[in-house]
């Protein structure tokens, strides 16, 4: 098993967007990383192309891929996968064994065997619908804010501290999810210290 690098992943995704070596130029992986940053593919991801790729980075890159314009422009990569529907995800449920997503623009059945945990309820975004079956493939939330992965050392009612000693202020009414259930930081922070 050889760990993939951020540069390798970015190169693959840039090629999926229609870019070729002759479009990029320069020295690999730096040239691909620079062009990927220009088109928004690496937003929220380390720009060190030689670093090992984490699962969180891979997930963020794929999410960014769905939002990124193809090389030809005028269309996002998501729209190459099927019909896209803009709206707010109001609820996700399962009825009769089939998962359904109810958007502000209509209700869609998920691809067979798929279900949603409801974590994206209330978010605005794009639903990708399979052109042949009419079933929902995935929901891509709009890019809201940023994220950072840290190793937690301790948590208090108004802050958390990582193992590097950095402290992050957290309002007690900040929404968090614990075991798939919505809660507030003030109610849920204690389980982090357990």
Residue locations for each model-derived region?
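N-terminal propeptides
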Residues: 2-159, 165-167, 184-190
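Short, intrinsically disordered, charge-balanced linker/junction segments flanking boundaries
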Residues: 174-175, 181-194
